[in-house]
C-alpha cells in the first residue's frame, strides 16, 4: 500500500516520474523487494491473463559493430574477464518480404566483453551467403524453416513455375543462416543451426571466416546445434542421413585436435547408424544426451514427413509444414557405446513426450540416468510463429495458455537386462529416484519418469534453456541446473533448480526478459554453484535499458548489471569464453 500511495504522489507532482521511478526501484533494495513480491499479472498453474506484449523483442534491430561502453551498476567480480557471446535472430524482413517464424530471422551475433569490472557491447549480422543474397535482391531469396522463398518476380511465368521443382535439399538453395548456437570443434568456434552448414567465426571480431559443409566430410544431411564434449576436446554430435534403405540417425565423432592449421572438421567419423523406427517419418530432434561412456538418442513422436518435406516447394509450403506431433507413437530411447559405436540391444520406451534440451546424463549401478526438459504436447514449433509471438491482449494470453510447458524429468535406463528377468519387474536398482524401468512381456522396457520439481515450478511456467557447470559435471551425478522460467512466451525469469531436494531459487524483474543463463565458475572452484550466472536481460519498454546481469550462483542474488542503450531481440543460445 505504501508504494502505491508513494507512486500516486510522485506522479501527481512530477512530470519526470516515469523516468525517475524505474531507476529508483532498481537501485533501492526495499522497493525492489516490494516489487518482487507484488503480483504483476494473474497466473494459476500456467493460465495467465494480462500478459504484456513483447513484439518489440521480436522485431528487426540495427547492428552495433563499434563497441559501446556499458553503464555498470553494482559489482562485477574482478576475475570475470572474457566475452559472453550470444546468437539469435535479428532481422525479420527484406524489402516487402517478411519471415513467418521466429527461427527464420537472420543471425545477429552479440558480444559482451568483460575486463576488470568494465563491460563493452557490440553486435554484427552474420555475413552468411543467405544474408548477402537476400540483401542483394532486397527480398527473401533462400527459404527458411517456416518461410518459403517466393519465385523471382523478374522471371517469366514458366521459369517461376519450374523453380517450384527445385529440391529443398539442393545445396545452392539451402540456408546457411546459422542462428542457433556457438559450438566448438578442434579449438575453433562455429555458428550452427540444423542444416549441413556451419559458419566459422572469429570470436574477437565477430566476422565469418569460413563456411563448412558437413556433407563434404561425412554422409549426413545436417547435425544438431548442441554437441557434447569429452574432457580431451573430442566432440560428439547427431546427424541425419537418407539413403536407399531409408532414413537413419548418425552418431558423429570429431577429433579433438588439428593435424594441419587450416583444417576444420577433418577426421570426423560416423561411429553408429540408427535406423528410423518409421522409415518415411523419422523424428525431429534438437539435442541428445551423453555420459562418460554412452550416447543417448531420443526418438520422439515429433515426426518429419519426408514426402511433405520433399514436395514442400511444389506445394508452396515451408519446411515446417512437414513436421507434425503424432502422440499415438511412444517415445524411444537408444543407447550407443561411445568407444565401440555399438548400439545396445535394450529397447526402452516411454509415453509420448517432446524434448528440445537435455539437462544432464550420468551412469550409476549399471544404469544410464538422463534428465530432460519435457513437454507433453509437441506443438511448440507452431506456437513460435511470429504472428503468435507478436500478439497482444487476450490473443496473446490464449496463445500462451495453449502452449505446452516444459518440466524437468528423470528417466532410468538399465543397461544389463537379464533375459530371465520376470515380466513386470522394475529393473532400476536406484533407491534415490522413483523413475522406473519395467520389463514388458515382449522384452521391451517401459520407462516411467520422476518429476524433478514440485508445484512451485508450475507457477513459474515451467523451465527451458537448461544449463549446468558443464566442464566439471557433464556426464556426472549433479545437484543443480539453471534455466529460464516461462510465464510468458519468452523467458521471464531465471531459475536455479536443486534436483536432489526439488527446490527453486528465482530471479525476476517485472517487464524484463532474461536469456538462457550461462554459468561461469570462479577460479579454482570445485563447487557446482561456485561462480556466477550471466544472462542478457531485455525489455520492450523504450524508457528502460537492456543489460547483462550477474547473479551469485549460490544464493541467486544480483551482484551487478551493465546497461546498454541498444535495442536487442530475444535470442537463443550462447557461451562464455574466458581470457
Curated annotation (Swiss-Prot):
Pfam families: RPE65 (PF03055)
GO molecular function: 9,10 (9', 10')-carotenoid-cleaving dioxygenase activity; beta,beta-carotene-9',10'-cleaving oxygenase activity; beta-carotene 15,15'-dioxygenase activity; carotenoid dioxygenase activity; metal ion binding; oxidoreductase activity, acting on single donors with incorporation of molecular oxygen, incorporation of two atoms of oxygen
Cofactor detail note: Binds 1 Fe(2+) ion per subunit.
Record's signal peptide: none
Residues reported in the UniProt entry to bind Fe cation: 226, 286, 357, 573
Protein EC: 1.13.11.-, 1.13.11.71
Cofactors, names only: Fe(2+)
Locations listed in the record: Mitochondrion
Cystine pairings recorded for this chain: none
Assigned protein family: Belongs to the carotenoid oxygenase family.
Tissue specificity field: Highly expressed in retinal pigment epithelium. Also expressed in stomach, small intestine, liver, testis, kidney, adrenal gland, pancreas, heart, skeletal muscle and prostate (at protein level).
Main enzyme class: oxidoreductase
Example GO biological process: zeaxanthin catabolic process
Record's GO cellular component terms: mitochondrial matrix; mitochondrion
Function: Broad specificity mitochondrial dioxygenase that mediates the asymmetric oxidative cleavage of carotenoids. Cleaves carotenes (pure hydrocarbon carotenoids) such as all-trans-beta-carotene and lycopene as well as xanthophylls (oxygenated carotenoids) such as zeaxanthin, lutein and beta-cryptoxanthin at both the 9,10 and the 9',10' carbon-carbon double bond. Through its function in carotenoids metabolism regulates oxidative stress and the production of important signaling molecules.
Alphabetic keyword roster: Dioxygenase, Iron, Lipid metabolism, Metal-binding, Mitochondrion, Oxidoreductase
Name recorded for this polypeptide: Carotenoid-cleaving dioxygenase, mitochondrial
Catalyses which reaction(s): all-trans-beta-carotene + O2 = beta-ionone + all-trans-10'-apo-beta-carotenal; 5-cis-lycopene + O2 = 5-cis-10'-apo-lycopenal + (3E,5E)-6,10-dimethylundeca-3,5,9-trien-2-one; 13-cis-lycopene + O2 = 13-cis-10'-apo-lycopenal + (3E,5E)-6,10-dimethylundeca-3,5,9-trien-2-one; lutein + O2 = (3R,6R)-hydroxy-alpha-ionone + (3R)-3-hydroxy-10'-apo-beta-carotenal
Amino acid at each position: 500500500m505504501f508504494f502505491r500511495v508513494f507512486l500516486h504522489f510522485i506522479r501527481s507532482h512530477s512530470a519526470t516520474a516515469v523516468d525517475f521511478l524505474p531507476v529508483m526501484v532498481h537501485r533501492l533494495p526495499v522497493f525492489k523487494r516490494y516489487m518482487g513480491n507484488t503480483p504483476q499479472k494473474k497466473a494459476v498453474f500456467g493460465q495467465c491473463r494480462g500478459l504484456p506484449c513483447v513484439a518489440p523483442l521480436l522485431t528487426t534491430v540495427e547492428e552495433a559493430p563499434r563497441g559501446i561502453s556499458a553503464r555498470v551498476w553494482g559489482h562485477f567480480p574482478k576475475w570475470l574477464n572474457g566475452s559472453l557471446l550470444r546468437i539469435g535472430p535479428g532481422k525479420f524482413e527484406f524489402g516487402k518480404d517478411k519471415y513467418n517464424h521466429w527461427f527464420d530471422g537472420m543471425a545477429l551475433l552479440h558480444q559482451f566483453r568483460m575486463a576488470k569490472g568494465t563491460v563493452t557491447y557490440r553486435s554484427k549480422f552474420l555475413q552468411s551467403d543467405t544474408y548477402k543474397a537476400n540483401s542483394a535482391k532486397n527480398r527473401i531469396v533462400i527459404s527458411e524453416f517456416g518461410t518459403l522463398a517466393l519465385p523471382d518476380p523478374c522471371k517469366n511465368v514458366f521459369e517461376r513455375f519450374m523453380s517450384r521443382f527445385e529440391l529443398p535439399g539442393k545445396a545452392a538453395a539451402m540456408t546457411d543462416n546459422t542462428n542457433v548456437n556457438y559450438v566448438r570443434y578442434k579449438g575453433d568456434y562455429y555458428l550452427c543451426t540444423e542444416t549441413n552448414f556451419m559458419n566459422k567465426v572469429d570470436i574477437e571480431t565477430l566476422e565469418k571466416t569460413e563456411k563448412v559443409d558437413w556433407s563434404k566430410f561425412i554422409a549426413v544431411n545436417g547435425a544438431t546445434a548442441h554437441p557434447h564434449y569429452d574432457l580431451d576436446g573430442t566432440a560428439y554430435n547427431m546427424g541425419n542421413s537418407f539413403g536407399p534403405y531409408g532414413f537413419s540417425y548418425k552418431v558423429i565423432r570429431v577429433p579433438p585436435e588439428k593435424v594441419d592449421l587450416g583444417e576444420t572438421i577433418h577426421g570426423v567419423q560416423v561411429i553408429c547408424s540408427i535406423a528410423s523406427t518409421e522409415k518415411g517419418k523419422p523424428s525431429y530432434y534438437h539435442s541428445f544426451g551423453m555420459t562418460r561412456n554412452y550416447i543417448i538418442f531420443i526418438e520422439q513422436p515429433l515426426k518429419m514427413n519426408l514426402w511433405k518435406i520433399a514436395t514442400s516447394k511444389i506445394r508452396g509450403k515451408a519446411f515446417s509444414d512437414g513436421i507434425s506431433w503424432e502422440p499415438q507413437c511412444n517415445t524411444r530411447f537408444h543407447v550407443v557405446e561411445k568407444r565401440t559405436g555399438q548400439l545396445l540391444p535394450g529397447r526402452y520406451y516411454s509415453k509420448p513426450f517432446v524434448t528440445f534440451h537435455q539437462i544432464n546424463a550420468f551412469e550409476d549401478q549399471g544404469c544410464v540416468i538422463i534428465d530432460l526438459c519435457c513437454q507433453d504436447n509437441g506443438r511448440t514449433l507452431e506456437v513460435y510463429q511470429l504472428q503468435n509471438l507478436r500478439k497482444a491482449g487476450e490473443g496473446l494470453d490464449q496463445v500462451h495458455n495453449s502452449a505446452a510447458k516444459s518440466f524437468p524429468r528423470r528417466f532410468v535406463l538399465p543397461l544389463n537386462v537379464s533375459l530371465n528377468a520376470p515380466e513386470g519387474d522394475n529393473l532400476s536398482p536406484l533407491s534415490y529416484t522413483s523413475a522406473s524401468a519395467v520389463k514388458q512381456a515382449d522384452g521391451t522396457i517401459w520407462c516411467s519418469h520422476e518429476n524433478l520439481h514440485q508445484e512451485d515450478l508450475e507457477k513459474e511456467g515451467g523451465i527451458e534453456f537448461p544449463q549446468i557447470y558443464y566442464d566439471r559435471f557433464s556426464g556426472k551425478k549433479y545437484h543443480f541446473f539453471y534455466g529460464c522460467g516461462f510465464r510468458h512466451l519468452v523467458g521471464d525469469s531465471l531459475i536455479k533448480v536443486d534436483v536432489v531436494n526439488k527446490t527453486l531459487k528465482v530471479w525476476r524483474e517485472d517487464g524484463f526478459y532474461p536469456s538462457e543463463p550461462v554459468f561461469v565458475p570462479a577460479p579454482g572452484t570445485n563447487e557446482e554453484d561456485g561462480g556466477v550466472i550471466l544472462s542478457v536481460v531485455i525489455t520492450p519498454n523504450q524508457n528502460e535499458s537492456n543489460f547483462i546481469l550477474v547473479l551469485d550462483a549460490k544464493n541467486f542474488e544480483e551482484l551487478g548489471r551493465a546497461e546498454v542503450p541498444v535495442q536487442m531481440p530475444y535470442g537463443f543460445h550462447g557461451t562464455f569464453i574466458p581470457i
